[in-house]
């Protein structure tokens, strides 16, 4: 009996020591963390010199789903802040983030009226930001104040929060289309071959020349009829040979939509984006996004889906991910399993285990590795890791 107990204790000890954790970020690494809360999108970026940026902080307030990851003991915003502090530990001020970028004004990216103080507002209880960037500062009037306030019932709260931060020293800015300097390395900018390129926002895109922009909607169309998604901020991050695309909920158009609503902004920006290594699926992989022409032009090796409801992604979009419209591999990652039943096991089998999705680009930007961290644990153990890919 004693021998059996000793063997069991030894096995338990071996199991505990076998757990693996993501090695700490270090100078020269570029990390992208797609944070899994079950309630919206949030991406934490640690740049090679220690500059940090949080993109979005969603919380739908159980409007679409009752999923809470890792559990409901904290709000999604509180879990986002907890996650950021955990992985920013190697930095001098883990609670201070250099940039916050809000891609657009929807609850699954900023917070919901159903839970006052949710999303971004909960994040502010723990984290501070040196710069806040969104698509509409300071007037918040495009395409009209009425349409913006209609898109989000927490706009008053959001504007007050940003202005409150500005009064305490935070810098607020409108996303500058065409800029390669608005978001940049702040500590050792000359040491690394790194660039963030602002491509589109507010239905306008960079022309590729200077800071000139052009509208993406036709003159005959009433821009006020668009939903908020098409105004999303879209940008690329380049480090050496590695390139990452993130475009909020930017939309394309199905064949049936093109005649009714000219919302195919994906096709227009695709040539500016060009081939990428990793992309976050636009609009959570919903049916109106990540169309074949966009995929063919970007040709990502890795597609990451951040989900907040059933239909993230839709089956038709997941099939587009898998369709060989371009040569080479395409690895699929996802932050939750809410769409598993609708997708079916055949499609689901193409996704890596779900959870916090981490892209780690190694020093110089010529190699990277994918990790998935346990969305139910408080210490973020690794549940999947890829080989190291060389570019």
Question: Can you describe what each PLM-predicted range is?
Answer:
Residues 97-108, 279-283:
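Metallo-beta-lactamase
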Residues 258, 263-358:
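Long, structured stretches of catalytic cores involved in phosphate-ester chemistry, encompassing
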Residues 4-14:
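Sec-dependent N-terminal signal peptides
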Residues 60-62, 106-110, 139-140, 205, ...:
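Short acidic, S/G/P-rich loop/turn micro-motifs used as interaction or catalytic elements
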Residues 41-45, 53-55, 61-66, 205-210, ...:
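Short, solvent-exposed loop/turn elements at domain surfaces
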Residues 25, 50-100, 115-122, 253-272:
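Pre-active-site segment of Zn-dependent metallo-hydrolases
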Residues 20-31, 37, 83-86, 92-99, ...:
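Flexible, acidic/histidine-containing loops and adjacent segments that form or flank the divalent-metal
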